[in-house]
Each structure stands twice: as C-alpha cells, then as structure tokens.
C-alpha cells in the first residue's frame, strides 16, 4: 500500500510549530525536495565566501547524463552558480544540481543536513549525487539489492563504483521505484519544515538571493493578496511524489505545508493534480480571514 505524510506548521522565530499532520516523523522519500539541502549548503558557502554566485561551473558529460530541464548546454559550456541554483529549484534541473554538489563537495551537503535539522543525517551519508543514485536505482548493472543491504562503508564503495562507469539506463526498470530498495533521498515532514525555515534564515546578506530563488516558481495557484510570498519545492520519481511550500500570509505569518507520497509501484500522472487540489484546500483553511 501507499505510505504518506502531511504537515502544516507555523514558523515562528525560525522554529516549526506543527498545527496539523499525519506521520510527520516518518522518514519517507524526498525526491527532488533533497535539493533544498544543496541550496542550504550553497547559501552557507556564499556566506563564508568560499563560493560566489558569479563563479562558473563547467558542464561535464557526467552531469549531462542525469538530464537537464532548462539548461540545454553542451559539454564544456559554463554556467554561473546563481543560474545553476535558480534552475535546480525552479525547473528541478538535475544537471545543475550535480554541478553544484560537485562544486561544494558531498561533505558540505552532509554538514548541511545536520545544520538544517535533519533528524538522521547518517541515513543520507554517504550523500549520493544524482548521477550516483540514478546509477544505483535505474542503471546497468542492477545494484538495487546490493544497495538495500549495504552498510555505510559498502554504500560508499558502490557510489565509487558507479562513478567509474558510464550511466546506462536500464529500460526494463525505468518506471519501477528504487525507493523500495532505499535508493532515494530521505527525510520526514518535520525535516522538510526545518530545512525551509533554515533557508529563510539563510537568505540574508550575500545569500539573500535564496529568497527569490525559492519563490520563482510557486507551484500552486493561490490568491497573491492573501499569500504575498510563496517559496516551493516539489519532486517526483517512480513511486514517489512530494510537495512543499514555505508561504507567508498577508499578516506576515510564515507557514510550511508538505506532502510526501510513496507507492510500491509507479504512480500515474493524475495524482499530481489531485494533490494540488488538496493543497489548495489546506491553504484555504489556514488563510487569515
């Protein structure tokens, strides 16, 4: 059967105060919501002056292998950190994500899990790049079973192995969930609220563009006179569908609303529209009168 979580929380002074929810402590697939941890790590690097928004990243064959949804660039082309971050959030660009992880280093993402309040950073250590996770989940050879039963050390070896071979998607598994084998990025509804709150706190000084990056695509139609700011990140992989919003109402009260759904087989396309209707109803319930 399906597993799911849902949470509505107020954010006060950077802390999440749950108002309603189900299974809010359960670790479930994040799909592309994991990219919020990459953005949080990037914001920290920008604050500490180790990375600048204007730094250029060079497109590699490996980063292109995971697909791009907005940066149709050839190998060797260069893209700024700022543009990569914008695309990673707005169009969930996988190539941009891996270029940023490569620039920051996976250690920085693992540290970001901790500083953003993830309940179990060890569960995402070693932190897989998209190339690595796609290789484990959907590539040849099939490494899913190996991954499922592997210790942290063995998982690190598996990730090294995927990096030494070209990613070849296995068409027979293209639509089968890898989350059944633990090949996903994981977090709870509580974690999702905390990383949204962390990103809001990040968005000051040199890292202030984070606020605009998060809100470029609201991902939901709400009355903007009631909800003047809507930051959003959603995700979808076979069997996994996730939504999250950091929205500020007209009184200035921030809210985080999230949904995570997980099925043992691929879900159809209709469920997305249905979930967005549910989300709109939730926002209607919490909107100031």
What are these regions (language model features)?
Residues 1-128, 133:
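Active-site-adjacent loops and short helices of periplasmic peptidoglycan-processing enzymes
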Residues 3-4, 91, 97-196:
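Mid-domain, small-residue-enriched loop/turn segments at the edges of structured enzyme/sensor domains
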Residues 12, 17, 54-55, 93, ...:
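Acidic-enriched, low-complexity/disordered segments with a strong bias for Aspartate over Glutamate
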Residues 25-33, 41-58, 131-142, 153-158, ...:
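Charged, low-complexity, helix/coiled-coil-prone segments
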Residues 54-56, 60, 80-81, 126-130, ...:
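General structural signal for secondary-structure boundaries
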Residues 170-289:
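Structured C-terminal helix/loop/strand segments within mature extracytoplasmic catalytic/sensor domains
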């Amino acid at each position: 059967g399906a597993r799911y979580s849902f949470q509505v929380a107020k954010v006060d002074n950077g802390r999440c105060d749950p108002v309603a929810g189900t299974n809010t402590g359960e670790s479930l697939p994040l799909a592309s919501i994991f990219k919020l941890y990459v953005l949080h790590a990037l914001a920290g690097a920008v604050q500490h002056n180790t990375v600048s928004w204007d730094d250029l990243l060079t497109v590699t064959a490996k980063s292109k292998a995971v697909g791009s949804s907005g940066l149709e660039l050839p190998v060797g082309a260069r893209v700024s950190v700022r543009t990569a971050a914008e695309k990673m959030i707005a169009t969930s660009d996988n190539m941009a994500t891996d270029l940023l992880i490569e620039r920051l280093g996976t250690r920085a993402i693992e540290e970001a899990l901790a500083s953003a309040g993830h309940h179990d950073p060890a569960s995402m250590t070693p932190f897989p790049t998209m190339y690595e996770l796609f290789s484990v989940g959907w590539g040849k050879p099939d490494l899913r079973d190996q991954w499922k039963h592997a210790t942290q050390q063995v998982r690190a070896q598996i990730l090294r192995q995927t990096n030494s071979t070209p990613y070849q998607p296995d068409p027979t598994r293209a639509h089968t969930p890898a989350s059944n084998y633990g090949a996903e990025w994981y977090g709870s509804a509580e974690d999702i609220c905390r990383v949204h709150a962390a990103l809001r706190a990040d968005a000051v000084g040199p890292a202030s563009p984070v606020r605009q990056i998060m809100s470029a695509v609201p991902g939901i139609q709400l009355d903007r006179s009631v909800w003047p700011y809507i930051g959003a990140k959603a995700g979808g992989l076979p069997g996994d569908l996730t939504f999250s919003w950091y929205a500020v109402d007209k009184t200035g009260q921030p809210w985080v609303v999230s949904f995570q759904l997980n099925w043992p087989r691929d879900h159809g396309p209709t469920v997305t529209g249905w979930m967005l209707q549910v989300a709109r109803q939730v926002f209607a319930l919490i909107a100031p009168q």
